């Protein structure tokens, strides 16, 4: 491994430790399959908004995903940060980072290990850390639809703002993700992912998410996406809704070789 690759992975590791979005589940597979022809990729998305007068508010968000591909392995690093204020009061403060290593075994099969940290002060999540591993089965076609299925397990450590105790549990990890190229516009595609993560010792404690994303490629490096997401937590913290619906849209610029 060259010193450039080593530096890239070191930077990802440092950011992972430092970053510590209370989305209990975060879909990263759309980023994993981005730009399949590239061995290295770094994509950044920035969003700044604000208003003054009757409505005084400011918001900023930064997202990045990075890939390092080899013949038998792939590294993925994804992170985001968002903060918002309204009338001089903080209304959002999220941080998230995910690092994943995939070893390919042939026939579309592979093994993966991953680590993740996240926080969201306004959804009472002081910190959530997890470390896990699993098996994946990739049924993607070179120029057609993509299908990926995975099963695994991870250890989760969660600390809520409202509780002194830290919760440590083992969770199962089951997911499926699909990508379908569309002819509606140049380079457009529709992505869908679904995850289910039950507590192994108490299946009544269940987390799940479904994400749909429509992507239009404006140039080789610039794209715009529209995302809808629904997540469910059977045992949310006190004062937090069990169900949550999110939507977002914005441009993304990609550096690749």
Regions found by a protein language model. Name each.
Residues 243-257:
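Outer-membrane beta-barrel "beta-signal"
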Residues 1-38, 256-257:
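Cleavable N-terminal export/targeting peptides
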Residues 46-50, 77-83, 113-117, 133, ...:
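Transmembrane beta-barrel strands of outer-membrane/channel proteins
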Residues 48, 62-68, 99-103, 133-137, ...:
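Residues on the lipid-exposed face of transmembrane beta-strands in outer-membrane beta-barrel proteins
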Residues 72-77, 108-111, 143-147, 182-190, ...:
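Repeated loop/turn-to-beta-strand initiation elements of outer-membrane beta-barrel proteins
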Residues 24-74, 78, 85, 254:
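Outer-membrane beta-barrel initiation region
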Residues 50-59, 86-92, 119-127, 163, ...:
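Solvent-exposed loop/turn segments connecting transmembrane beta-strands
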Residues 40, 56-60, 91-95, 127-131, ...:
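Residues that define the transmembrane beta-barrel architecture of outer-membrane proteins
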């Amino acid at each position: 491994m060259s010193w450039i690759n080593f530096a890239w992975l070191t930077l990802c590791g440092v950011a992972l430790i430092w970053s510590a979005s209370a989305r209990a589940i975060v879909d990263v597979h759309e980023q994993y399959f981005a730009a399949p022809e590239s061995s290295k990729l770094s994509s950044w998305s920035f969003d700044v908004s604000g208003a003054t007068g009757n409505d005084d508010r400011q918001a900023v968000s930064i997202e990045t995903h990075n890939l390092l591909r080899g013949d038998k392995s792939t590294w993925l690093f994804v992170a985001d940060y968002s903060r918002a204020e309204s009338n001089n009061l903080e209304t959002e403060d999220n941080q998230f980072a995910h690092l994943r290593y995939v070893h390919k075994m042939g026939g579309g099969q592979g093994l993966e290990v991953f680590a993740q940290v996240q926080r969201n002060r306004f959804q009472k999540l002081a910190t959530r850390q997890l470390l896990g591993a699993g098996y994946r089965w990739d049924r993607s076609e070179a120029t057609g639809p993509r299908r990926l299925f995975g099963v695994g397990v991870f250890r989760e450590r969660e600390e809520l703002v409202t509780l002194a105790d830290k919760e440590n549990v083992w969770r199962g990890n089951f997911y499926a993700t699909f990508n379908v190229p569309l002819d509606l516009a140049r380079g457009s595609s529709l992505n869908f992912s679904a995850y289910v993560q039950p507590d192994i010792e108490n299946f009544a404690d269940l987390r799940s998410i479904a994400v749909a994303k429509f992507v239009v490629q404006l140039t080789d490096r610039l794209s715009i996406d529209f995302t809808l997401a629904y997540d469910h937590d059977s045992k949310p913290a006190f004062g937090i809704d069990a169900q949550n619906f999110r939507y977002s849209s914005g441009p993304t610029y990609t550096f690749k070789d």
